[in-house]
Amino acid sequence: MARLIEDEAGISALVNGLKRVAVLGIKTEGQRGQPAYSVPEYMQRVGVEVVPVPVYYPEVTQILGQPVFRTIAAIPGELDLVDVFRRPQDIDQHVDDIIAKHPKAVWFQLGIRNDEAAKKLVEAGIDVVQDRCLLVEHSKFAAK
């Protein structure tokens, strides 16, 4: 049963199962210093397949050496997680797209919380983490 994951055991189980992560709102190499680039770069470095889904940059065809997709639903294959780098008020426009793909979980990065979107995702059977940094939690809980 899907749930809002807030406990450390749930976070640990989630980050230890990550193999393929779509990053909604990923930045390009030109914004290397921003978390929306550095977090997915870290995830790729530790062996997680990163699927870039930029919201802007229509001319960009690759980020982190991977082909970009313009929607979550267009990504072939299964996703363990959609890592979201969008302002809280901008998440609602992506909920149906995320539900259509049905990843195992959705992660709203540190400072990002949208309870209504989280509720819809959980009701659709998708686990949700809000207001936490994936890089911090992964480096804290990932099996060494």
Task: Indicate residue ranges for each PLM-predicted region.
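Structural/interface elements that position substrates and couple domains in central-metabolism enzymes
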Residues: A2-D83, I91-K144
